[in-house]
Curated annotation (Swiss-Prot):
Alphabetized GO MF terms: ferrous iron transmembrane transporter activity; GTP binding
Protein name: Fe(2+) transporter FeoB
Domain FeoB-type G span(s) in chain numbering: 3-169
Organism for this UniProt entry: Salmonella choleraesuis (strain SC-B67)
Residues holding GTP: 120-123, 149-151
Length: 772
């Protein structure tokens, strides 16, 4: 079979991702475009005659980049197409918005690269009474047009057949430009490298006249002639870019008049009716908060019901199984404990997180595909404008509920460097899925019937602190107003199940692999460090270990937030949590249960793997049956506790060490707000600079320590009024000093602000193929 590379390109919300998932299934690979942290997805699929590599390009409305401060999506899409790597392009077009989508189509066809138009969302178009003559559209465009409903898989085989039959586009002169424009485009084309096809050279000439800044990198000596061409055009027309765009829109209008009835189409009545409620200025925000609470509720309920299968199953295989192997093969006791507690305990920490994190990713994917996520940005626009940000900046922040890394990377969709940087600084405060795992454990141990409210309050607190961080930046070092916010609101539709599953699987797989590697390594390290004293001797009591000795020296620093000296395990959890937040659970689980593992004698004669796995299945089935009872729906956290006794095990030790719910909640505030994990730090450094990464770390530590101290000292004021008063005053004075210093630093920071993405944008200013 012949190999074929195809670029998949289209407007945002045109169904491009759904089509990509339909064609490639699970055969996908996610990486980054060279030099930037913009996600690059590739997938594999086969037709009758070809083995195809499909490259999913960023969604874009146009290939024209007017400013270096614009979104990176247009830059990457344009440079990939011009690199010549793609043998064929599939342009996904939203049939219900034909006129707007055809602007990108015309640019692709003018470039002369073989192209297939995938006319998607025909079901939505039909509901809006839109009729399109597909054959007439194909004739007018001079390329194949394949009707699709990608959410249902309709038209996929026809698309594969069109790929096998692909040829060069018919040489149809689509757009009739003014003669002066053609003359100057030809003049510029003659000065370009003759190895490039004439059609592409003329296209580059028009792009240069339109003001596209990156086409000059491909124009060679022609770039030096641009000023001459513009000077000649100035005598004949006011604005060449306006004339070029007008000629394209006239062509689009002429095509639509012939092939469709878009002028008489009816907007979706369902979408209009729902938007009257969802976008209501008074109801919009409460509805958004309810949706976020519902996401948390489902993650805890359904994810918690599936947890016994992953928890008890991993204990049976990776802890008891390792102990049985060690006993059978006569391993030394210290080695068996080390492997069971380190390797087995690490795996046992990761796997129980899978169902709850997976349910949250599934819910987020549903919100994105259904069309609600765009509405959430619109609802938050008024609040974001108060911060000097457009509502569009809230979209990457919402993504932060899943993971802060794509949240930071999502800031690239914003146009102004100031807006990107402010969004990046706010992103780490959004409570990610790994933090949910920590909150759920503490809620079950300390808050009982109020567990759901406690966890939800932490989510809201994260949003509030992100907003306050934005206000602080706006009034100190990043003053300015938001750019105008224009955003397309797609019609509501039922997401495709296959697409939801694939998106959830990709995110969950990334989480498990990333978290698993870190947790297992940390668990093994902690197990070793917890088995020896500072003098190198093996210890029987973990309180005599080197880890305990070092941690006790550091723990007094956290006394103001409620971490007592004997609770050195909590201090270790904070340090390991800087690598990955989910490691906090693994650390506490390893340390709080270490004595139990050392003290409990293992009898290999009593170990039966099959019985333990069957027990895990039975517990899971019982949990699923109980999941939707009224008591569980009203109390998801309490239900997730299961049948475990608080007096024993990790939860019992943790309850004794913290001593009160106030101390535990204060600890959770610190975990929510302090330094982001290593992956997020790296993303911040790549998207901005190491300096801004350092600022984010220091600001997060200050906010976390200050807020946790204020909460704990206020709630426990009656126990030690003098100490509490000193702590509260110290926090207030310190933050007043910090804010005054930031206000004074504004003039110096403004100069450096515009350069924060210079290293990122420059990747697209080189020669062809530099962005792939």
């Amino acid at each position: 079979m012949k190999k074929l590379t195809i670029g998949l390109i289209g407007n945002p919300n045109s169904g491009k991702t759904t089509l990509f998932n339909q064609l490639t299934g699970a055969r996908q690979r996610v990486g980054n475009w060279a030099g930037v942290t913009v996600e690059r997805k590739e997938g594999q699929f086969a037709t009758t005659d070809h083995q195809v590599t499909l490259v999913d390009l960023p969604g874009t409305y146009s290939l024209t980049t007017i400013s270096s401060q614009t979104s990176l999506d247009e830059q990457i899409a344009c440079h990939y197409i011009l690199s010549g790597d793609a043998d064929l392009l599939i342009n996904v077009v939203d049939a219900s918005n034909l006129e707007r989508n055809l602007y990108l189509t015309l640019q692709l066809l003018e470039l002369g690269i073989p192209c297939i138009v995938a006319l998607n969302m025909l079901d939505i178009a039909e509901k809006q009474q839109v009729r399109i003559d597909v054959d007439a559209l194909s004739t007018r465009l001079g390329c194949p047009v394949v009707p699709l409903v990608s959410t249902r898989g309709r038209g996929i085989e026809a698309l594969k057949l069109a790929i096998d039959r692909h040829n060069a586009n018919d040489n149809v002169e689509l757009v009739h430009y003014a003669q002066p424009l053609l003359r100057e485009a030809g003049f510029l084309a003659d000065a370009m490298a003759q190895e490039m096809p004439l059609q592409q050279r003329r296209w580059l000439g028009l792009q240069m006249l339109e003001g596209d800044i990156y086409s000059r990198a491909y124009a060679g000596e022609a770039a030096q002639n641009l000023d001459t061409s513009l000077a000649r055009l100035k005598d004949e027309m006011d604005d060449p870019a306006l004339h070029i765009a007008d000629a394209r829109y006239q062509c689009i209008a002429a095509i639509c008049d012939v092939v469709s009835n878009t002028l008489t189409a009816e907007p979706s009545r369902f979408t209009r009716a729902v938007d009257k409620i969802i976008l209501n200025r008074f109801l919009g925000l409460p509805i958004f908060l309810f949706v976020m609470y519902l996401m948390f509720l489902l993650a805890i309920n359904i994810g918690g019901a599936l947890q016994p299968l992953f928890d008890a199953g991993s204990v049976a295989i990776f802890i008891h199984g390792i102990q049985w192997i060690g006993y059978t093969l006569h391993f030394p006791d210290w080695l068996t404990i080390f492997l069971a507690q380190g390797l087995g305990g690490g795996i046992n920490t990761v796997l129980p997180l899978v169902p709850q994190i997976g349910m949250m990713y599934l819910f987020l994917s549903f919100l994105e595909d259904s069309g609600y996520m765009a509405r959430a940005a619109f609802v938050m626009d008024r609040l974001m404008q108060a911060l000097g940000l457009p509502g569009k900046s809230f979209v990457p922040l919402i993504v932060g509920f899943g993971c802060n890394v794509p949240s930071v990377m999502g800031a690239r969709t914003l146009d102004a460097p100031r807006e990107r940087l402010m969004t990046i600084m706010m992103a780490p405060f959004m409570s990610c899925g790994a933090r949910l795992a920590i909150f759920a454990v503490f809620a079950a141990a300390f808050f009982g019937q109020n567990g759901a409210l406690a966890v939800f309050s932490l989510y809201v607190l994260g949003i509030v602190m992100a907003v306050l961080t934005g206000l602080m930046l706006k009034h100190t070092i990043m003053r300015g107003e938001a750019s105008p916010f224009v955003m397309e609101l797609p019609v509501y539709h039922v997401p495709h199940i296959k697409s939801l599953i694939i998106q959830t699987w990709q995110r969950l797989k990334g989480f498990v692999l990333r978290a698993g590697k870190v947790i297992i390594i940390v668990s093994i390290f902690l197990s070793a460090f917890n088995s020896f004293s500072l003098s190198g001797k093996i210890v029987d009591n973990i309180n005599d270990s080197a880890l305990a000795s070092v941690s006790r020296v550091i723990t007094p620093v956290f006394k103001p937030i409620g971490v007592h000296e004997d609770n050195w395990q909590a201090t270790v959890g904070l340090f390991t949590g800087a690598m990955a937040k989910e490691v906090v659970v693994g650390t506490l689980n390893t340390l709080y249960t270490a004595e139990n593992i050392q003290d409990e004698a293992f009898n290999p004669a009593d170990f039966h793997l099959g019985d333990e796995l069957l027990g895990a299945v039975d517990d899971t089935w019982q949990s699923l049956k109980d999941t939707f009872s009224l008591s569980v729906l009203a109390n998801p956290i309490e239900a997730s506790k299961g049948d475990g006794e608080m007096a024993t095990g990790a939860m019992g030790v943790m309850d004794q060490k913290f001593g009160s719910a106030a101390a535990a909640y204060s600890y959770l505030i610190f975990v929510l707000l302090y330094v982001p994990c290593i992956s997020v730090m790296g993303a911040i450094a790549r998207e901005s600079s190491r300096g801004w990464m350092g600022f984010s770390i220091l600001w997060g530590l200050n906010i976390a320590y200050s807020l946790a101290t204020l909460f704990y000292q206020v709630t426990s004021f009656s126990q030690h009024p003098t100490y509490s008063l000193i702590c509260i005053l110290a926090v207030i004075v310190f933050n007043v000093v910090v804010l005054s210093l930031l206000r004074r630093a504004r003039s110096r920071v403004d100069i450096e602000l515009l350069a924060t993405r210079k290293n990122v944008s420059s990747c697209c200013s080189g020669t062809a193929g530099n962005c792939h």
